């Protein structure tokens, strides 16, 4: 729908929504054109600002947390003004939904582009994207702000190829509770060791995440993506820094850049300003080298949408002839409470569809996913069904399943009674497991069998901590729902 932008150029540049606009209903200020995608925090729509004709993105977020925290984070976004950070124009609070109006980046996220093209990026493309990303991080860190969710899904490109940081301070960090639920615990693959260990962290935590993102762009997915997120939580602080699967494919400069990012000690990790002087970044080419891959990705998206529409039209004809009989080419939508039918999508839902890797990365990683045909609702905004339960993070479903298993099987207790002592079962801080050589086979087998119950106990502690933080927030929401207003 880029023709809308070309035929109706902005009459003036939108910098910020004025007070008059913020007192109106959002539908009076914007015309929604289409749904762009779905993220872990809600839906994203493409819209046009009626007064200026400017294209914007609107993220509709169901608010399940402390409104005061959200307002505080939005005030932080209002302070940011950089060409390398997605601009924030204003917000509307309507019922229990937060509508966030932001800068529109027509090419989508780097993660989207990788998935659509079915290709990883070249070193030149990665260097150009990293250069813009580092400039954005340098700005945020100069403002003493931490992004906390750097990954390919949160680096957006406009149609000219300029990379911009997204989901800073608003949808990516609504509150500590939501951030830990959807970022730290739900997708730990990009998180710095000090963040996972909760020992305090500063701006260079973003640099570790940037190093992981560099590997993600090169290989299609981050390290540890093939294992359960909860296991990754314990492995990242303990194991040596990750590196490329096939180092021989990459230049010394690129590998050294990643090495500088992935230093486990925060005090010794490079800053954004220092990394902008790294040879790999200083030799980066202009954004024009990204235009071909952007055009290719947008062409693929358009062709898929056209093909999907043809399938829908064909199936509609078949359905009209068969009078509500299911077509053999259609499948029931999982979890569809309305019982409607949709065409089976041929797109992979994972973060990686490259041939050399399996599609094992969990799909709900907080990265916007491209629409399937059934998600398109004629460009209208759709309010969240209040009867629907919010999607559970994968690790909570994992908890619940394990709890059921533990009720049936008391094996964990039996094993724990036979352990030598609790100190023997702690993960060595230096990663040295030489002491295992002195253990008997029987002791080793007991240790192996006891690992899962131990992990369940540690996860239960995390869950209890989550609950203790969540309940006061829920109580506060009830009090603040009576004060619905635009801001």
Swiss-Prot record:
Give residue numbers for the modification (Phosphotyrosine).
433
Task: Answer whether the UniProt record assigns the keyword Transmembrane to this protein.
Answer: no
Phenotype upon knockout? Mice show progressive hepatomegaly with a 2-fold increase in liver mass relative to total body mass at 1 month of age and a 3-fold increase by 3 months of age.
**Provenance organism:** Mus musculus
Query: Which Gene Ontology CC terms are recorded?
Result: cytoplasm; cytosol; nuclear body; nucleus; protein-containing complex
What is this protein called in UniProt? Serine/threonine-protein kinase 4
Kindly list the organism's lineage. Eukaryota, Metazoa, Chordata, Craniata, Vertebrata
- The annotated active site, in chain numbering, is 149 (proton acceptor)
Q: How does it assemble?
A: Homodimer; mediated via the coiled-coil region. Interacts with NORE1, which inhibits autoactivation. Interacts with and stabilizes SAV1. Interacts with RASSF1. Interacts with FOXO3. Interacts with RASSF2 (via SARAH domain). Interacts with AR, PKB/AKT1, TNNI3 and SIRT1. Interacts with MARK3 and SCRIB in the presence of DLG5. Interacts with DLG5 (via PDZ domain 3).
Q: Which reaction does it catalyse?
A: L-seryl-[protein] + ATP = O-phospho-L-seryl-[protein] + ADP + H(+); L-threonyl-[protein] + ATP = O-phospho-L-threonyl-[protein] + ADP + H(+)
Gene Ontology terms, MF aspect: ATP binding; magnesium ion binding; protein homodimerization activity; protein kinase activity; protein serine kinase activity; protein serine/threonine kinase activity; RNA polymerase II-specific DNA-binding transcription factor binding
Q: Give the encoding gene's name.
A: Stk4
The protein's matches in Pfam families, at most eight in alphabetical order, are given as:
Mst1_SARAH, Pkinase
Which family, according to the similarity comment?
A: Belongs to the protein kinase superfamily. STE Ser/Thr protein kinase family. STE20 subfamily.
């Amino acid at each position: 729908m880029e023709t809308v932008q070309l035929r109706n150029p902005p009459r003036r540049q939108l910098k910020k929504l004025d007070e008059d606009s913020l007192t109106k209903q959002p539908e009076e200020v914007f015309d929604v054109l289409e749904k762009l995608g779905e993220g872990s925090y809600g839906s994203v729509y493409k819209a046009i600002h009626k007064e200026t004709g400017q294209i914007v993105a609107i993220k509709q977020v169901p608010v399940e947390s402390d409104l005061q925290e959200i307002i505080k984070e939005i005030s932080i976004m209002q302070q940011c003004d950089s060409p390398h950070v997605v601009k924030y124009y204003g917000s509307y609070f309507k019922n229990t939904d937060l509508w966030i109006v932001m800068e529109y980046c027509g090419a989508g996220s780097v993660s989207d582009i990788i998935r659509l093209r079915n290709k990883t990026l070249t070193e030149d493309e990665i260097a150009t994207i990293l250069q813009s990303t580092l400039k954005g991080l340098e700005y945020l860190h100069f403002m003493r702000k931490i992004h906390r969710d750097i990954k390919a899904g949160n680096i957006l490109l406009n149609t000219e190829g300029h990379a911009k940081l997204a989901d800073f301070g608003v949808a990516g960090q609504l509150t500590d509770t939501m951030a830990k639920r959807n970022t730290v615990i739900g997708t730990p693959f990009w998180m710095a060791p000090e963040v996972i260990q909760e020992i305090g962290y500063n701006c260079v935590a973003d640099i570790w995440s940037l190093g992981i993102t560099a590997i993600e762009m090169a290989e299609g997915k981050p390290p540890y993506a093939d294992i359960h997120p909860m296991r990754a939580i314990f492995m990242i602080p303990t194991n040596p820094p990750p590196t490329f699967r096939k180092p021989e494919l990459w230049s010394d400069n690129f590998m050294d850049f990643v090495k500088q990012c992935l230093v486990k000690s925060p005090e010794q990790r490079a800053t954004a300003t220092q990394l902008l002087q790294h040879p790999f970044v200083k030799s980066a080419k202009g954004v024009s080298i990204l235009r071909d891959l952007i055009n290719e990705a947008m062409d693929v998206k358009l062709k898929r949408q056209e093909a999907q529409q043809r399938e829908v039209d064909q199936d509609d004809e078949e359905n009209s002839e068969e009078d509500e009989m299911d077509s053999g080419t259609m499948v029931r939508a999982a979890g569809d409470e309305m019982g409607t039918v949709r065409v089976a999508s041929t797109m992979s839902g994972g973060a990686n569809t490259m041939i050399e890797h399996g599609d094992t990365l969990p799909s709900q990683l907080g990265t916007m996913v491209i629409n399937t045909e059934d998600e398109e609702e004629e460009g209208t905004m759709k309010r969240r069904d209040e009867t629907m339960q919010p999607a559970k993070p994968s690790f909570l479903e994992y908890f619940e399943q394990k709890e059921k298993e533990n009720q049936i099987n008391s094996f964990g207790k039996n094993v724990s009674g036979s352990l030598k002592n609790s100190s023997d079962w702690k993960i060595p801080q230096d990663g040295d497991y030489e002491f295992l050589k002195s253990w008997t086979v029987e002791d080793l087998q007991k240790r192996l069998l006891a690992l899962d119950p131990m992990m369940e106990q540690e996860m239960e502690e995390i869950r209890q901590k989550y609950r203790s933080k969540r309940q006061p927030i829920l109580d506060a929401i009830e009090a603040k729902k009576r004060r619905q207003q635009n801001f």
